Structures are given as C-alpha cells and as structure tokens.
Amino acid sequence: MDTFENLTLQKERYVSSAFIDSSLKMGIAQSVLMVQDNLTECFNQMGCDGIVYREKFNAFWVFTKTRVRFLRRPYWRESITARTFPIDNASFKAHINTEILDAQNKPLLLANQQACVLDLEKHRPLKISSLSYPKENFPSPVFDEPFENFHVDFGEENFQFEQIIRSQMIDMSHHMNNIEYIKLALNIFSDDFLQANEVDFLEVHYQGESKEGQVLRVYAKNIDGRFFIFIKEQERLVFEMTIAFK
C-alpha cells in the first residue's frame, strides 16, 4: 500500500511581472495559472503527477473544473504563500484545495479544483482509488463552495468573436492549454472594464479538447450582472465559465 507522509505543498512565492495584468495586480488568468502550477508541484511531491502516471499506469490527469474566490489580488512584487493539498479521493474524481496567503497570513484567494484520470489509449476514466493516490487522512478543506451546473441557454445573438487556435496556445498535451481558454473568455471584457471592476469569483468547466488550427467561437451572456461565457468548436462545447465582479 502506498503511503503519503506529506499531503500539503506550501510554497513561498513572489508576484513577478509574469503574473500581473495591466492593473499591476496578479491577473485573473494568471491567478488560476498559479493555482494550477502549485497543484502540479503538490502532485509531484506526492509522487502521483502526470509523469509518474504515464510511466506506471499509461494514464494522465485531466482537470475538469476550477472554482476560485478572490478576496484580494496581490500586487506586483508582493510576497505570498501558496498552500495546496488534496481533500478527498472520490473513486473516479478528486478535489484539491489551494489557498494563497499574504505576508500576514491573511487569505487572498481560495480555490478548489476537480480532476480525473484517463487511460492514455482509450481516454476512459480510471478509478483514482485504484491508483497511487492518497486515500485517507486528508487535510480539512479551506474552500468548500460547491461547483455549479450552468443551466443557461445561449445562441448566435450572444456571439462575441472567434479565434483560430495557434501553436503558442497548445501545451504538452498537444491540445489548447487550460489557461488559454480563460484568457480567451476574459477577452469579452475591455481593459477599461477590468480596471474598473474587481473580480469576486469565477468557475470554469473544461468540457472538451481542441487542437491547433481549429476555430473557436466565443459566446457571452450577462444575467443580472453575472457573466456566463461559452466556447464552442463547431457545434461542440469545449469550455464554459461564469464570473462575477464585486
């Protein structure tokens, strides 16, 4: 039986210029990037990251949902601490919490991610409980807001723009990178809007894969000040996001 002595990755980080937007604060998409990066390093620390799973199980991780609550976005050159840890092992899916804290140990950002594991050849889900992954003694969650189902209809009247997927938008999976979807969704807003409105929370669902050369169509709907953004490849929904501002 595999043993996991340390389930929490705590990393001292620094908000470098690579992580800020035009407000000189950590950007919205860049915040999710830091959460995702810390998760990857946490999995590496536990010996269950994508490299290990590919070699041992011919499998790979897929991150299906992310929800982030923004309390305060840190500024450029601010020192922060990022803590990431798994909170469960629910057979075919797992949830992982991240909290980002300021120098006074006050929370800046709280996040929960949902992930599953797929067989590399047939892309069928595998039981995480049967793999090398923690099964007990999980740390207490710091963020337990439930994921939502987006029951929102949209049509061509909600179309915003389209984007061809280029080579620099794909990653090691040879599919479009998760963060690139978020950046694309955020492009429905002007820079002036994002400067004037501070983000409260967002939730993203990665619904499918898309590849270089495909054309993505972006749709958006504002319902009582809350935005729902959908990205389609032809008739196939590949990404959806909701975002609210304070």
What are these regions (language model features)?
Residues 78, 155-159, 215:
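Short coil-to-beta-strand transition motifs
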Residues 58-73, 197-209:
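Small beta-barrel nucleic-acid-binding modules, principally OB-folds
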Residues 175-246:
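Structured core of small recognition/catalytic domains
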Residues 2-63, 110-112, 119-198:
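Hot-dog-fold acyl-thioester-processing enzymes
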